[in-house]
Each structure stands twice: as C-alpha cells, then as structure tokens.
C-alpha cells in the first residue's frame, strides 16, 4: 500500500492523482500527523505542473463540470477530502462519462455530500456575515468557517 503525502494544494493533489488513480488501495492525504498503516510506503508528492495539467485536461474531456466539483470537494475541512475526490475521479475515469447523477454509488454520494456542505456553508455566510468598522475606518468581519469558503463568498461582498 502506498500513502501519497501532498502539500494540500490542488496542483499537488492532481499530481498525486496522476499516479494514485491506478494505484488501488492507496491513500492520498495532506496530513502530516496521519497514522501510517503497517507496511505502507510513504511517497512525498512534489507538484508537477505537467502531470497536474494532464489530469485536469482528461477530466475536462470526460466531464466539463468535474473540475469545479472537485475544487469544491477539496475545499472541505475534513481529512478525507482528498480520498473523496480521488474516488470520484476514479469513477469518472472508469465510466468515461459524467457520473454526478449516479446517486446510488457511494463515491458520488460522498462527493455530493461534501459539495453540499461547502456550498451550503458559503450560502449561509453570505446571508449571516456582519461587518464592523475598525478604528481606522476599515470594515472587517471576523468569522471561522468549517470549510475553505473565503474565495467563494468574497464576490458577494465586493
């Protein structure tokens, strides 16, 4: 079994997918405090823009909306986000067609759940986030989301 350690960026994740997609039973994680299974080989993934671009090009050819969905999955605040995205990508590559409507498949269900949690939290914060004026006249809104949603809600406030 191989464990692919990424740096947490989407480009590094897609670089890991280049090898991990065909490596059944592997684990992709950015966690440095990950409990390594007995006998597992650790592979430190270094971002390779060529491999990352090839994976993204293949995904766009299969399903144009898959890149956005995977981007939302990778914004999830849980440790399993890379594995959820990897299983979704494996299913896309296996079927060679969009799979978002295969709601009985566990990988699709898990991916849709992750997407729903990220987009739902972003929607909630656009409605409930309140700004305060600082001493120097700058407005700010302290908040602590469960997921990485700042880039998703920013256009709403500009």
What is each of the regions a protein language model found here?
Residues 21-24, 58, 62:
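Generic N-terminal helix/loop capping motif
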Residues 2-3, 30-32, 47, 51, ...:
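Extended, charged helical/alpha-beta scaffold domains that provide interaction surfaces
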Residues 1-49:
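N-terminal ordered "arm"
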């Amino acid at each position: 079994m191989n464990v692919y350690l990424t740096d947490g960026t989407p480009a590094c994740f897609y670089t890991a997918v280049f090898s991990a997609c065909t490596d059944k039973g592997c684990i992709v994680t950015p966690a440095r405090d990950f409990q390594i299974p007995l006998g597992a080989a650790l592979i430190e993934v270094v971002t390779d823009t060529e491999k990352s671009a090839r994976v993204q090009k293949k995904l766009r050819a299969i399903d144009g909306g898959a890149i956005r969905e995977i981007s939302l999955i990778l914004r999830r605040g849980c440790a399993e986000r890379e594995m959820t995205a990897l299983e979704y990508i494996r299913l896309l590559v296996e079927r060679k067609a969009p799979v978002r409507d295969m709601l009985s498949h566990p990988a699709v269900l898990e991916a849709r759940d992750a997407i729903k949690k990220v987009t739902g939290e972003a929607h909630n914060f656009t409605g409930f986030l309140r700004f305060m004026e600082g001493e120097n006249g700058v407005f700010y809104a302290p908040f602590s989301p469960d997921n990485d949603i700042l880039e998703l809600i920013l256009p709403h406030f500009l």
